[in-house]
A protein has these predicted regions:
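Multi-pass membrane glycosyltransferase architecture that uses lipid-linked
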Residues: 1-197, 204, 228-342
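Glycine-centered helix-coil hinge/cap
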Residues: 83, 191, 215, 221-224
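Extracytosolic (periplasmic/ER-lumenal) interhelical loops and adjacent juxtamembrane/interface segments
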Residues: 207-218
Length: 342
């Protein structure tokens, strides 16, 4: 926190101000672009700030404490399911600390709710309890309403054994709950268009390996190519096909391990991604600890420390670890190697 903060924190301040005045973050005039759950965290932090109005750091401290609590709960899950030592290592690992304490991003909340969903679904399938299963599927929808980290995971659940009705239910319930979470703001056709535009159609992140191979720059633009739009569509389709293919491969594995691998695959084949999403493979890093994942962790940590969007402390080949380079693609190569080994 002594290093300052990422620009996302300034966005949170602006979002909280809009909410304080009774405004709508899905009006088309605000920079938000996330599901509705996070705005309640921002409102809570803003209310806490009002109590301690003389200390202007309370808002950020509350956000950091909330995000740290999410990290702790994920660590507790790892400790109980795998190893206490691994859980402790996850909780204190510097990458999570940077994303939570400096960047103040909340992918960990989406992952945490997803973990809760998987635990509930696993218990429901073991005891053949339909209502419990529906609750677990609803939690996946809630996770999507935080961030779209588990966007394709219902398809992975569809591939798992069961009757056609059971498999269709696994797909339908999460998406219905996810869409229902937007109901209070989707009050007109125009508002629905704005939500779709901000949540699904905004171009975000830096180019991954597939876009790099197509000749795109770090922002995803393929300069001087007449096939730019077609190339992006093909790459997007390849991402979806790749994620679905691994869902089929993982259909007979335990549901907990399938989630861990899903988080890796989702990032490994993404056309573009933001650096806060580099926390998604961390569950696999600490649970499986394969050679390529260890290398991924070390390279990611060096990148987090050096790049200007995070700590900005340059000490080791800064040209290689710059934001507008190919580091995003090389990190994906390591994740693809792990995915293919699974």
């Amino acid at each position: 926190a002594l290093r300052g903060h990422n620009l996302d924190y300034l966005a949170w301040l602006g979002n909280a101000s809009v909410l304080r005045d009774g405004g709508n973050l899905y009006s088309g005039n605000e920079t938000y672009g996330y599901g509705p759950v996070w705005m309640f965290v921002l409102r809570f932090a803003d209310l806490a700030q009002n109590i301690f109005s003389e200390n202007r750091q309370v808002f950020r401290l509350v956000i950091i404490l909330v995000l740290t609590t999410f990290d702790l709960m994920i660590a507790i899950f790892i400790a109980k399911k795998f190893s206490l030592v691994v859980g402790l290592l996850f909780f204190v690992n510097p990458i999570s600390v940077i994303i939570t304490g400096y960047h103040n991003q909340f992918d960990n909340l989406a992952v945490l709710v997803g973990i809760g969903a998987i635990l509930v679904i696993s218990e429901a399938e073991f005891g053949n309890r339909q209502k419990t299963l529906w609750f677990g599927l609803a939690l996946i929808g809630l996770s999507l309403a935080v961030k779209q980290v588990l966007l394709f995971y219902p398809i992975w659940l569809f591939f798992r054994a069961g009757t056609l009705r059971q498999r269709l239910t696994r797909v339908a319930v999460p998406y219905v709950i996810y869409l229902a979470c937007f109901a209070p703001w989707a009050t007109s056709i125009e508002r629905i268009k704005i939500i779709v535009e901000e949540i699904f159609l905004q171009r975000r992140g830096r180019s991954g390996i597939l876009l790099n191979l197509a000749g795109a720059d770090y922002a995803g633009t393929i300069h001087g190519a007449t096939y730019s739009d077609l190339a992006r569509q093909i790459i997007f389709a390849a991402w979806i096909i790749g994620v679905f293919a691994f869902g089929w491969i993982m259909r007979n594995r335990s549901i907990i391990h399938s989630l861990v691998v899903y988080l890796v695959v989702m990032l490994a084949f993404a056309p573009a991604y933001s650096q806060q999403q580099l926390i998604l493979p961390l569950l696999a890093v600490f649970i499986y600890a394969t050679t390529e994942l260890k290398i991924f962790y070390v390279v990611t940590l060096i990148f987090m420390v050096q790049n200007s969007d995070e700590l900005g402390i340059e000490f080791f080949f800064p040209f290689v670890f710059r934001l507008n380079g190919t580091i995003y693609a090389w990190l994906q190569v390591l994740l693809i190697i792990f995915s293919l080994r699974m």
